Regions:
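Short alpha-helix in the alpha/beta-hydrolase fold that links the catalytic acid
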Residues: 194-204
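Catalytic active-site module of serine/aspartate enzymes centered on a nucleophile-bearing elbow/loop
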Residues: 217-268
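Short beta-strand/loop motif that positions the catalytic acidic residue
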Residues: 178, 184-186, 190
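Conserved alpha/beta-hydrolase
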Residues: 18-20, 25-50
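Gly/Ala-rich beta-loop-alpha elbow adjacent to hydrolase catalytic centers
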Residues: 84-89, 93
């Protein structure tokens, strides 16, 4: 694929700032890869929080990701860029790959669409959140205040999230499918992104030939580690090992030079 080891750009989950992923970035660096966490609007130290006067959308977050991917490419030409999207970050990663110059590869962890029909028992809590709680609170306050799920959340982004929960309509164009190599990781017992919802996410947005699935089972969790939807990133060695192995296998079957910027990556 290339003589350069990749750089991993971590796109945080909803309500989590980049500082949470220091252990994850460190685990990649210990394996000889570069890695850094991208900022999450509204959740960085010293940055503006969502409010009636501070608003943004999925497309704004996607554009932030596009700027970060371009910057990573310019730093070391020819180095593969992999986006690792965690939860909400996975949705943004898919939107980026479909609507901007794509990264060379995508990894999602606990990534699913919040469409209630993709969840067990009809996803009633998600349906309630999307149809009632988000519209009412954003209408009253001009944003989604804490302690509501994802709060403080930007009005436009959370309303887009809510519409997706109710109707399944994506907050970005999705006529095509992601064709860059993609590793979709499910977390055993994850109630926020159960395996069935992760699989539906893959079917809706990713070309089948591009996707590799992995379920991080309870039995595979080392002592002192976790495969919880959030806490896996504090003890990320099993996830990082899986990603490195997956990408190494991709490199073994991809012609030298890899995919050019803006072109779909190789099938997996």
């Amino acid at each position: 694929m290339t003589r350069h080891q990749p750089i991993v750009l971590v796109s945080p989950a909803m309500g989590i700032g980049s500082r949470y992923y220091q252990s994850l970035a460190g685990a990649f660096k210990a394996r000889g890869w570069a890695a850094r966490a991208l900022t999450r609007r509204g959740f960085e130290l010293g940055a503006p929080r969502a409010s009636r006067g501070q608003d943004w959308s999925y497309d704004d977050e996607i554009e932030d990701m596009a700027v970060a991917v371009a910057a990573a490419r310019s730093e070391v030409p020819g180095r593969p860029v992999i986006i690792l999207g965690h939860s909400l970050g996975a949705q943004i990663a898919a939107g980026h790959q479909l609507n901007r110059v794509p990264a060379d590869g995508v990894v999602t962890v606990g990534g699913a669409l919040p469409y209630h029909r993709d969840y067990p028992w009809g996803g009633l809590p998600i349906l309630l959140m999307g149809s009632v709680i988000v519209p009412v609170l954003t209408g009253v306050f001009g944003y989604l205040p804490a302690p509501a799920f994802g709060g403080p959340g930007a009005r436009t982004l959370m309303r887009e999230w809510g519409r997706m929960a109710v109707t399944g309509k994506m907050p970005f164009p999705a006529a095509a499918r992601v064709r860059s190599p993609s590793l979709l990781i499910s977390l055993d017992g994850d109630r926020l992104a159960p395996e069935i919802a992760v699989e539906a996410f893959g079917k809706r947005l990713f070309a089948p030939e591009s996707v590799t699935h992995w379920l991080y089972r309870h039995a595979d969790v080392p002592d002192g580690a976790s495969n919880h939807h959030i806490y896996w990133a504090r003890s990320p060695a099993p996830v990082v090992d899986r990603i490195v192995g997956w990408w190494t296998a991709q490199a073994a079957v991809t012609p030298a030079g890899g995919a050019a910027a803006g072109e779909p990556g190789p099938a997996s």
